[in-house]
């Protein structure tokens, strides 16, 4: 279980919690809690796509999360409200609803005090420092400085403290956990009630997270509580169809972080794990170690969907499966060979049984003496079990190991000795990857309880052998007997196509070598048979080949069983449903695009009309200005005075008397102004010529009334001449 954080411990002890960063506090308090004022004015530029800090519609509105004085939240961070309408954004209980509202983008949960910035984002940042997937408002931390401790509910803190102290307060040994875990437990119980097969660990190993969840994402809790996958990172490839190692894919996992499976170019045909779910539920790792929660608290909330063992019995079952399958399948393979009934009555019956016992004893010695032999023996067991089915008495033939090839040197403890012994056993083609993996773990000193070298693969019931084409592309043979196997493949295939009339002679040693080579060169990845020799081996048995059987055990019928047909029908219905959903989505998108195109055309038309109106108004303005200018020029050409005259009045006899008096007074004022101007002009001109300005002073009178030319020609002052004498 997760440990109590510092902020949570502080809240539990009664001390004030750690102060939030300004950016975190702003988002927790204000993000999508107020309506955008620019949107009401139709001016918000962040509406499409919707990246606005405030909400535009009610279904985008987020309630502000609060932690009350009693230590509880105003609404749960995990349990969704069943009354909330996602289309209208309305809840009958209003803001006082104690449950989570599934708003657009699930903002109430992502930006809750319990979850906001408490986890690291898996996506990178761009040049501006924004998340390339979620943009500016990413609810996950980008870097250690952006992380914040979660603020927990008092009930969750009490449950965590009880788990840490080993005090289980719930009934039947179940602790009083937070509401989110309780909701997951309720979902698991509902799934087990609907389909009891999930209680079987073999069914969980073969089907967990291999099919897409039929429920909509918003109506499922997802996570470990749902046995179906919801995204590519949650998906697990079906181990019955795909064969891959328990090693993480280097293209997907970097360090401790699992990336997107789409990063791998190999896709589903990749030989490595693409997710944590694929690795934990891999047949080599599943139920191979004890569950940590069961070890510490005696309770696991994941129940049957846990990838780790809950009891010592399940651990023992995992370790015994390979040996049990090896012994049972070896016996069935021997008893199902043609001519075995005849040899039972022969004198060599004891030697045959002794040979079989010696094979098993040598395998046991090999697995005990050599540190890397456990993976080899378990791979052989799993391959034999998978080829014959789990718990079925199928007469399908598998060639057995020759007795002369099995003795090993118990003192050989080096890699060279192990590989050399494997070559002597004709096992060089089986599980080379597990040898490399075990060697790496021995070099690194991984001897803990979670070491993969000590885990045995789990038999997957109903697993189908691979086709020759898949085997040739995924498993490369390095044995010196591979060329011999290939040379023998032609006649063996031809003999397999025809019913055998008598047992083939297996007396010569080359034939024995070919049989052993063909048997163990077919053991591909993780010890699962996957070559054409599985089909060839059917020629030595009166029963059909396992490659023609689709059920968990070989049968005389070549048609698939009802479960397989039901599964195919479900997949077909699911594909049809997806196609219908895609068609509906495409129709909606097409209608939206058509509406946007119509709006764009209308906007362009309105802009064109407005531009033409503007051009017309400018043209009219220029015409009016030109007409005014022309009238002014005509008035100047007529030479009319600015003073009002009688010519503009027309017949003055028709003018009323008051207006005539007003006109008279105005004309008098104008006349006086004209007289004043005339007097001033005359006072400046010469009295004699009245053309030039006066400038000469006459003597002795000192009058300045004549210009210089007139003063020279006139001896007397004209001003004094016109004046009477003073006496």
From Swiss-Prot:
Pfam families in alphabetical order: zf-C3HC4_3, zf-CCCH, zf-CCCH_11, zf-CCCH_UNK, zf-CCCH_UNK-like_4th, zf_CCCH_5
An annotated GO BP: protein ubiquitination
Coiled-coil stretches noted in the UniProt entry, renumbered to this chain: none
Pathway the protein acts in: Protein modification; protein ubiquitination
Zinc finger (RING-type): 686-721
GO CC annotation: cytosol; nucleus
SMART domains reported for this sequence: ZnF_C3H1
Tissue specificity remark: Ubiquitous.
Localization of this protein: Cytoplasm; Nucleus
Gene Ontology MF terms in the entry: transferase activity; zinc ion binding
ZnF C3H1-type: positions: 75-104, 115-145, 243-277, 285-313
Region annotated Disordered, chain positions: 1-21, 330-360, 446-514, 543-562
Database matches in InterPro entries: Unkempt-like, Unkempt_Znf, Znf_CCCH, Znf_CCCH_sf, Znf_RING, Znf_RING/FYVE/PHD
Major localisation: cytoplasm
Post-translational modification: Ubiquitination is enhanced by activated Rac1. The presence of the RING finger domain is not essential for ubiquitination to occur.
Extent of Polar residues compositional bias: 330-339
Keywords (A to Z) from UniProt: Cytoplasm, Metal-binding, Nucleus, Repeat, Transferase, Ubl conjugation, Ubl conjugation pathway, Zinc, Zinc-finger
Family according to the record: Belongs to the unkempt family.
UniProt function note: May participate in a protein complex showing an E3 ligase activity regulated by Rac1. Ubiquitination is directed towards itself and possibly other substrates, such as Baf60b/Smarcd2. Intrinsic E3 ligase activity has not been proven.
Domain notes per entry: Although this protein contains a RING domain, intrinsic E3 ligase activity has not been proven.
PANTHER family in UniProt: E3 UBIQUITIN-PROTEIN LIGASE UNKL-RELATED, UNKEMPT FAMILY MEMBER
Protein's name according to its UniProt entry: Putative E3 ubiquitin-protein ligase UNKL
Organism: Mus musculus (Mouse)
Record gene name: Unkl
């Amino acid at each position: 279980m997760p440990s109590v954080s510092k902020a949570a411990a502080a809240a539990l002890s009664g001390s004030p919690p750690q102060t939030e960063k300004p950016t975190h506090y702003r988002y927790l308090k204000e993000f999508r809690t107020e309506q955008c004022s620019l949107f009401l004015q139709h001016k918000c530029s962040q509406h499409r796509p919707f990246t606005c800090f405030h909400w535009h519609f009610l279904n985008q509105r987020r309630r502000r999360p609060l932690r009350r004085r009693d230590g509880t939240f105003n609404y749960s961070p995990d349990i969704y409200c069943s009354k909330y309408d996602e289309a209208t954004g309305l809840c009958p209980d209003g803001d006082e609803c104690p449950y989570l509202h599934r708003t657009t983008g699930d903002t109430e949960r992502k930006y809750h005090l319990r979850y906001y910035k408490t986890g690291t984002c898996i996506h990178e940042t761009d040049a501006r420092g924004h998340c390339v997937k979620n943009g500016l408002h990413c609810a996950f931390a980008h870097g250690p400085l952006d992380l914040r401790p979660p603020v927990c509910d008092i009930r969750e803190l009490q449950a965590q403290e009880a788990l840490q102290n080993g005090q289980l307060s719930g009934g039947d040994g179940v602790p009083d956990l937070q509401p989110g875990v309780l909701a997951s437990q309720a979902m698991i119980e509902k799934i087990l009630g609907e389909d009891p097969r999930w209680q079987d660990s073999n069914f969980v190993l073969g089907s967990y997270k291999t099919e897409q969840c039929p429920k909509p994402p918003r109506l499922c809790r997802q996570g470990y509580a749902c046995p179906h996958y919801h995204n590519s990172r949650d998906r697990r490839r079906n181990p019955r169809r795909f064969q891959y190692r328990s090693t993480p894919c280097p293209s997907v996992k970097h360090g401790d972080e699992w990336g997107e499976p789409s990063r791998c170019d190999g896709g589903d045909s990749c030989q490595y794990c693409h997710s944590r779910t694929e690795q934990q539920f891999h047949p080599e790792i599943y139920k191979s170690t004890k569950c940590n929660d069961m070890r510490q608290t005696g309770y696991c909330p994941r129940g049957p969907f846990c990838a780790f063992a809950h009891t010592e019995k399940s651990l023992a079952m995992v370790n015994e499966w390979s040996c049990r399958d090896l012994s049972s399948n070896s016996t069935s393979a021997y008893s199902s060979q043609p001519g075995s009934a005849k040899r039972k009555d022969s004198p060599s019956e004891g030697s045959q049984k002794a040979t079989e016992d010696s094979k098993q004893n040598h395998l046991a010695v090999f697995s005990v003496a050599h540190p890397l032999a456990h993976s080899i023996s378990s791979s052989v067991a799993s391959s034999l079990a998978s080829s014959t089915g789990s718990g079925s008495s199928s007469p399908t033939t598998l060639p057995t190991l020759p007795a002369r090839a099995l003795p090993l040197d118990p003192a050989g403890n080096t890699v060279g000795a192990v590989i050399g012994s494997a070559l002597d056993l004709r096992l060089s083609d089986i599980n080379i990857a597990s040898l490399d993996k075990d060697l790496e773990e021995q070099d690194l000193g991984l001897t803990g309880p979670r070491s993969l070298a000590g885990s045995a693969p789990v038999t997957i019931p109903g697993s189908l052998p691979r086709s020759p084409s898949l085997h040739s592309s995924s498993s490369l043979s390095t044995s010196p007997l591979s060329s011999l196997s290939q040379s023998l493949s032609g006649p063996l295939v031809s003999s397999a196509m025809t019913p055998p009339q008598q047992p083939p002679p297996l007396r010569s040693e080359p034939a024995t070598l070919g049989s052993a080579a063909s048997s163990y060169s077919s053991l591909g990845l993780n010890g699962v048979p996957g070559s054409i020799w599985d089909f060839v081996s059917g020629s030595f048995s009166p029963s059909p080949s396992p490659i023609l059987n689709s059920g968990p055990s070989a049968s005389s019928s070549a048609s698939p069983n009802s479960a397989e047909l039901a599964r195919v029908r479900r997949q077909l219905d699911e594909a049809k449903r997806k196609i219908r959903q895609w068609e509906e989505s495409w129709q909606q998108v097409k209608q939206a695009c058509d509406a946007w195109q119509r709006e764009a055309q209308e906007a362009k038309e309105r802009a064109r009309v407005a531009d033409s109106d503007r051009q017309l108004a400018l043209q009219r303005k220029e015409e009016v200005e030109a007409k005014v200018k022309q009238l002014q020029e005509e008035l100047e050409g007529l030479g009319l005075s600015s003073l009002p005259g009688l010519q503009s009045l027309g017949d003055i006899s028709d003018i009323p008397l008051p207006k005539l008096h007003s006109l008279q007074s105005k004309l008098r004022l104008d006349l006086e102004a004209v007289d004043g101007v005339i007097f001033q002009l005359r006072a400046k001109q010469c009295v004699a010529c009245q053309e030039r300005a006066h400038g000469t002073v006459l003597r002795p009178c000192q009058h300045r009334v004549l210009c210089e030319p007139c003063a020279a020609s006139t001896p007397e002052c004209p001003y004094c001449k016109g004046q009477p004498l003073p006496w």
